[in-house]
Amino acid sequence: MSAAAVEHPCDDEPEPMLVTANRLMGQLPGHRVEIIGGVITVAPPPDGPHANALTTLMIPFLAAGLHGDETRVLQAIGLWLPGGPEDYAIPDLAVVDADFDEHLVENNCYDPAVFRLVLEVTSGNYKSDLRHKVSAYAEAKVPVYVVLDRRHGRLHVLTEPTGCTYDSHEVYAPGQSAELPPSIGADLTLDVAELVEVGRPRT
């Protein structure tokens, strides 16, 4: 998602960041507000190709049986991050344990321990998904992070989180197939060419 940082006016007692974030969500319907590394970011509503790519991505996850008794496939579910006292992210897509609703932390966000995979489809600010969120999700020990980079026509699969990074970072181009780790709960391979084509930004 494309994101812009939000500046805070100077005052003696600034409101908590979660309060600011929730106020912005109320003022900007359809926008995605997150706190990553102690910085509030606001992403505008996605364009059509972004939404198309996300739906196309969901199909193989559902076909693999990942939306069942053991795991669920969910869009825009809040993930509470350990990187800051009020940090959270809202990935475009996630595979979570089926009992995720028993692990609510705060502000409609859930314990990162229930997340088996998170996935982002980039918009204008692709660097956030490939930099800041890499650190955030790795620190949260999310086992698999997938990024569809629409700008460069690539699919990134990051695994083996260690500290603030992932030890394994595979990049796939059209014509290749990306095999995801079975730890997500099923054997699953993504057709990179199809995803790049449906997600291609229209200029």
Regions found by a protein language model. Name each.
Residues 1-203:
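Gly/Pro/Ser/Thr-rich low-complexity, intrinsically disordered segments predominantly at protein N-termini
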